[in-house]
Swiss-Prot record:
GO BP, sorted A to Z: 'de novo' CTP biosynthetic process; CTP biosynthetic process; pyrimidine nucleobase biosynthetic process
Function text: Catalyzes the ATP-dependent amination of UTP to CTP with either L-glutamine or ammonia as the source of nitrogen. Constitutes the rate-limiting enzyme in the synthesis of cytosine nucleotides.
The protein's name: CTP synthase 2
Keyword presence, Ion transport: no
Region ranges (Disordered): 562-586
Reactions it catalyzes: UTP + L-glutamine + ATP + H2O = CTP + L-glutamate + ADP + phosphate + 2 H(+)
Active site: C399 (for gatase activity), H526 (for gatase activity), E528 (for gatase activity)
Organism of derivation: Gallus gallus (Chicken)
Keywords: ATP-binding, Glutamine amidotransferase, Ligase, Nucleotide-binding, Pyrimidine biosynthesis
Amino acid sequence: MKYILVTGGVISGIGKGIIASSIGTILKSCGLRVTAIKIDPYINIDAGTFSPYEHGEVFVLNDGGEVDLDLGNYERFLDINLYKDNNITTGKIYQHVINKERHGDYLGKTVQVVPHITDAVQEWVMNQAKVPVDDDRKEPQICVIELGGTIGDIEGMPFVEAFRQFQFKAKRENFCNIHVSLVPQPNATGEQKTKPTQNSVRALRGLGLSPDLIVCRSAKPIEMAVKEKISMFCHVEPEQVIFIHDVSSTYRVPILLEEQGIIKYFKQRLNLPIDDQPSDLLMKWKKMADRYERLLKVCSIALVGKYTKLSDCYASVFKALEHSALAINHKLDLMYIDSTELERSTEVENSVKYHQAWHKLCKADGILVPGGFGIRGTEGKLQAISWARTKKKPFLGVCLGMQLAVVEFARNCLNWKDANSTEFDPDTKSPVVIDMPEHNPGDMGGTMRLGKRRTVFKTQNSILRKLYGDEMFVEERHRHRYEVNPELTHCFEEKGLKFVGHDTEGNRMEMIELENHPYFVGVQFHPEFSSRPMKPSPPYLGLLLAATGTLNAYLQRGCKLSPSESYSDLSDDSSPEKEFPKSETS
């Protein structure tokens, strides 16, 4: 087993996760089996109870693990399925050690950070690195480990010490450290500064780790003189200094790394049995990145949510939309709309914000209402859903978005004016959305219906079923405490809102479709968590197809995107116009 540790310096949030994912992608393209581990130094057991403004979205894994969004990057880049134990937190490690102490496993010894916490970290990493994450269920050959935060943070010290010890246990030829640092460029001088990187590397060495590669992040391409300066003052060879500047898409990052000889370096440093030349997989990434930058046609989607001030709150939703847009040769224009700004109260308090929000909603080609919790902003979401339904605008509701679509339909089509979810009004006389008591025992963390669950289609005549390849069932990831009231579904179906999918017992309603509408769809699960760059999520793909007026043609062709089922470079005789009609006339 080979281990690659990715650490960060200067500041957090400079792209360690994308760089770690890109390194994994390059190694996978060389024919190696790669897994990934993310270490978060916070004391929380997992990310399940975080506000989205704290760390961005909560990513859900197949086994129900609620984890850091970086694990979503690993899954998308590497096309693997990780587990909750691939996300290590300080809380998990301390809980593990304290439980062992309570069971008497330490035989009365004083339990300390060194050696007990550090040993637990090493043991966890070695055990989890062996767990298969590919469909072939074979043991991985390389484990990429990202240490969250920055070197010098007090929270991360036990983990740094654990890896200082681990590098000797694993042996030099099996352990490699990549340090990601920022090279700022102050506007006052325009000069790229290396001092923060020098100090960061010095701090790393002072803690017992020495970088094998220094990845320098910058806004603009870094000059060769800067590379030589970092090489000299950080005591590494020039080829061990890698530059990654801001690029138009994250698909370009693996290519930048490969162009700077990282495959050759890993082959020598870790004695890997690989070729120096990139494989077909990396060539597909190159073609995909080139295609992304050449797209001319634009599809605009309005995302109506309550956490719109931070784009990371909807990271997987954005990626799922981007994957689908790229698959149909369109550039995505995602417009974030704060749902509270669509409400009547905003018109009174700030009419400019109100009209700007509605202007964005009206000009969008499609509307998406994602998941969320709490009553704030729900009336604005209901307004957006009502507008999409009445104006026949393509709409996708995910989790809470589906539940609110049911509430809106009940109020305006069934004339149940007090219809609501018991999450927002426990005493409503028309509880069209109810809680699931078996998933709400009292504690907040880990008490929802989580992870991969099977959804069975009820009917052959379903757009979603066709988008999923006419399968009898699908397996997607869930994260919810509330469900549509199954006792009232017949009232909706009589008026044209069809429940086309349910759980294996037939009790929980998981998919809705509205009759006589181009695309009005809701799903109780989160399909964005399973979307991949080369395998876009079907519900999101359907939204983009409907928004560009090509859904019917796609369905009539048997749900085939192009002559090639994976991303092929578009040549002169394989243009998007030939593969998709420009629009459908109504």
